[in-house]
Curated annotation (Swiss-Prot):
Species this chain originates from: Piper cenocladum (Ant piper)
Name of this protein: Photosystem II reaction center protein Z
Subunit composition and interactions: PSII is composed of 1 copy each of membrane proteins PsbA, PsbB, PsbC, PsbD, PsbE, PsbF, PsbH, PsbI, PsbJ, PsbK, PsbL, PsbM, PsbT, PsbY, PsbZ, Psb30/Ycf12, at least 3 peripheral proteins of the oxygen-evolving complex and a large number of cofactors. It forms dimeric complexes.
Pfam families: Ycf9
Keyword Transmembrane helix: yes
TM spans (from-to): 8-28, 41-61
Keyword set includes Ion transport: no
SUPFAM superfamilies from the UniProt entry: PsbZ-like (SSF161055)
Family: Belongs to the PsbZ family.
Main function: May control the interaction of photosystem II (PSII) cores with the light-harvesting antenna, regulates electron flow through the 2 photosystem reaction centers. PSII is a light-driven water plastoquinone oxidoreductase, using light energy to abstract electrons from H(2)O, generating a proton gradient subsequently used for ATP formation.
Keyword annotations of the record: Chloroplast, Membrane, Photosynthesis, Photosystem II, Plastid, Reaction center, Thylakoid, Transmembrane, Transmembrane helix
GO terms (BP aspect): photosynthesis; photosystem II stabilization
Amino acid sequence: MTIAFQLAVFALIATSLILVIGVPVVFASPDGWSSNKNIVFSGTSLWIGLVFLVGILNSLIS
């Protein structure tokens, strides 16, 4: 169970870093938002899911 928790935390950190770098790049590029809107929403949905997963796994480990 600890390995699953560690992998989930790593995935959350990696997704956070990708979104922190990627979202401003999408907004700054010309015509970037309209063409990459689905990717940003998918990344945000993945991030929200990982936050809940880490919380659930943390409650099971503690």
